[in-house]
Amino acid sequence: MNFVNNLFTLKKISIKNISFFRSIIRIETFNNSFCDSLGNFIKRVIFLTTNSYKIIYLKIYKIKSEFYDLPGIIENTQTILKNLDNIIIKINNDNVANLIIKKKGPCIITAKDIFSDKNITIFNPNKIIANVSNNIVFYCIMKCVNSLFKNYTDEFFQFKIFKENIIFLNNFKSPIISLNYYINKKIFNKKLKKLFFDIETNGSIKPVDCFKNCIFYIKKYFDLIFSFIGFKKYKKINVEKKNNLNLKINSVYLNSINNLKLSIRSLNCLKNNNIFLIGDLIKISKNNLINIPNLGKKSYNEILNSLKNFGLNLNSKIEYDL
């Protein structure tokens, strides 16, 4: 099996940080449909490989279940659970952490009142959890885990420390607020395209890190496939000349046909047949050019004269793809 060296080559990846929560990543250049296929693939993998941190179960003293309200607290228990669920938290350099809140009222309990046995970061510390109106103690112990450990169970926490009245929070939320990709065509060659990713997160992970994690996992999977098929053993097709001389691209070939200063009728006829560059035009034979629909002899002669001014002729051979 043979593989062409430059079927498509990526030349540049650039990142523009709009804010701490949003970044735009540009990848170029692509040919044909590679751009759309790769964009959809990377978008799906980013969602799969981006993890978050979540409180999975907790114990609030003197509360028997989520339907039992604690006297002296303005909010009901279900509202408190919603507030805890909306806290954006990250465990640094670990996957599991114990969290605790212990505060005596009257007071306002916020996310910054949470303490842990691990190094944690809370991105919305002013998030209100509950309002304590009476002179009581609000005491809550929680277990926070990485979303990769969805089926995590702590038997010591559940069955030895607290044998009952444990409240479970099962829904994991993705830290990605929005993720879109779009394609932009180059002006001088419509066959070449740029791929853009617009990533916005809640702050618990940087948008660039979402993209890096995605590429890391893709590489790990495909490294195994390449080693299995013995990719390096296949013979590659050399696109260069047999004498190994470097091909010099004439810059005129990459210019738009608008530079030929043709009439509007001639330009429209060429563009309707997907001829946008001078290099595309000179590869056509005289018979094929004159047979273009709606292109008369006057336009035909006009094109020949314009090409002669550039020292070019029809039916020219180009050893490389534009």
From Swiss-Prot:
<comment type="similarity">
    <text>Belongs to the RNA polymerase alpha chain family.</text>
</comment>
<dbReference type="InterPro" id="IPR036603">
    <property type="entry name" value="RBP11-like"/>
</dbReference>
<dbReference type="GO" id="GO:0003899">
    <property type="term" value="F:DNA-directed RNA polymerase activity"/>
</dbReference>
<dbReference type="InterPro" id="IPR011263">
    <property type="entry name" value="DNA-dir_RNA_pol_RpoA/D/Rpb3"/>
</dbReference>
<keyword id="KW-0548">Nucleotidyltransferase</keyword>
<dbReference type="GO" id="GO:0046983">
    <property type="term" value="F:protein dimerization activity"/>
</dbReference>
<dbReference type="InterPro" id="IPR011262">
    <property type="entry name" value="DNA-dir_RNA_pol_insert"/>
</dbReference>
<comment type="subunit">
    <text>Homodimer. The RNAP catalytic core consists of 2 alpha, 1 beta, 1 beta' and 1 omega subunit. When a sigma factor is associated with the core the holoenzyme is formed, which can initiate transcription.</text>
</comment>
<dbReference type="InterPro" id="IPR011260">
    <property type="entry name" value="RNAP_asu_C"/>
</dbReference>
<dbReference type="InterPro" id="IPR036643">
    <property type="entry name" value="RNApol_insert_sf"/>
</dbReference>
<dbReference type="GO" id="GO:0000428">
    <property type="term" value="C:DNA-directed RNA polymerase complex"/>
</dbReference>
<keyword id="KW-0240">DNA-directed RNA polymerase</keyword>
<comment type="function">
    <text>DNA-dependent RNA polymerase catalyzes the transcription of DNA into RNA using the four ribonucleoside triphosphates as substrates.</text>
</comment>
<keyword id="KW-0804">Transcription</keyword>
<keyword id="KW-0808">Transferase</keyword>
<dbReference type="Pfam" id="PF01193">
    <property type="entry name" value="RNA_pol_L"/>
</dbReference>
<dbReference type="GO" id="GO:0005737">
    <property type="term" value="C:cytoplasm"/>
</dbReference>
<protein>
    <recommendedName>
        <fullName>DNA-directed RNA polymerase subunit alpha</fullName>
        <ecNumber>2.7.7.6</ecNumber>
    </recommendedName>
</protein>
<feature type="region of interest" description="Alpha C-terminal domain (alpha-CTD)">
    <location>
        <begin position="244"/>
        <end position="322"/>
    </location>
</feature>
<dbReference type="Pfam" id="PF01000">
    <property type="entry name" value="RNA_pol_A_bac"/>
</dbReference>
<feature type="region of interest" description="Alpha N-terminal domain (alpha-NTD)">
    <location>
        <begin position="1"/>
        <end position="229"/>
    </location>
</feature>
<dbReference type="GO" id="GO:0006351">
    <property type="term" value="P:DNA-templated transcription"/>
</dbReference>
<dbReference type="GO" id="GO:0003677">
    <property type="term" value="F:DNA binding"/>
</dbReference>
<dbReference type="Pfam" id="PF03118">
    <property type="entry name" value="RNA_pol_A_CTD"/>
</dbReference>
